[in-house]
Amino acid sequence: MRRLIATILACVLAVVVVSFVLIYHYRDKVEKVFQMTETDSEAQSLTEALVPETEKAAPSTETELPLQTETEAPETEDPSLHAEDGVYTFLQGPVAWESKAPYSGIWCESELDGGLFSVFGCGLCDLANIYSTLTPFECSPLDMYWLARKVSDYSPGGGSGAIDWPYMKETLQKTGFEVRLRKKDRRYEKFQEAISGCLTAIVLISSEEDDSYWQDTPGHYINLWHYNPETDQIFLGDSGNPKHNRQWVPLRTIYDAISSQNTWQYLLVTGYDEEKNTWKYSGIHEKWTRPAWCKAKPEAKSLLMPAE
């Protein structure tokens, strides 16, 4: 019996000893793992401390600018779209004068040499446009009527009374302009080239050739200005129609309507020499509607004749 008890106690003691040994061994292992973890953490902290500033996401002390998106450059306005402000475009009809339309005047209801200016005055309006726009002077269509009577054989008596090409050429040359008379070009590109290379042009149109823009107009002089190659348009002076006057119109529309029944179809003004201007008259003394953008030019007496 005593042996049995001793054996049991010996076994219990052995179990206790083994347990203590195992516990101590496990505790030592856990402490080593914990120490290694702390060492790794310290090493990581040390590594972060040694990272250059450029690699660290440090907060910026500068004020951040807002993101800029790419914007288109502002469009440059075509100067030719504003050049028309200096262009004179006189009107000839009584309806325009009744409404006091810009560039209409008392000449719209005048009777000269037995004819109505409203019937025959388109070419004279164009001549006055050219003289008043391209020189330091200005005149009315009536002034141009008297000048044409003075320097050429023009007379409105009989027929339509409209001034013919040779008389327009003579009158313009007397006022210092270089002028060329042309026939309608067979190719539109040639007409386009001629218009783009001149200061201004007078063109004879007819609705019998093309009635898309003009109707019931067997023959009528119009004035072309400031050809725009980007849009292939011209600034139109149309003395017979206030709705057409001072509008940008496709040059092709003009070409299609050019009359083919006359010896000449259009006139080009290619230059101006003030020394060759034998008139140098300036002043519009008739009642008329001067637009706000059309400033009066200094007056000057005629070198050829007094104003009538």
Where are these regions (language model features)?
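Extracytoplasmic/periplasmic, Sec-exported soluble proteins
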Residues: 114-123, 136-139, 159-164, 183, ...
